[in-house]
Amino acid sequence: MEMTVEKTTPILEPMAQLNIGATFKIVPPPDGPARGHLSARDPVTGAKKWEVTYKQPPLASVLATAGNLVFVPDSEGIVHAYNADTGEELWSRNNGMGHNAGIISYMAGGKQYVAVPAGWGSLVADEFVALYGEPFKSMPKNTGALIVFSLRQ
């Protein structure tokens, strides 16, 4: 990513607008296209236990549960559930829209749920179209859904 810091005057009328005081552009790394990965590390030694790679960088947060699961919502719209010890993919679902927000887990009525915000639209989303084309070019922008799954006990 290339970033230029600029002093700008915030736009306040007719309503406040985002002003981060910088412009940025995502550019591919010099050694090839940008990719993403999730790696699990031993917390004591730092040794890599396992790694999963993605065609594009996932933009959403990662969720680890006490039940030994790791959830990763990827940029293409697929939610992956992995075994935290081995990295084996246990489950996945295509939500039809990219993910770029936080995933959470909660308990209600004695049952555990995972809630995944889905939708495509942000400063970064526009840059993904320029870098990767499809499927991001065809994704509806500024849409959203909250998709909730229950976990088996």
Feature annotation, model-predicted:
Residues 5-59, 63-153:
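Extracytoplasmic/lumenal domain signature
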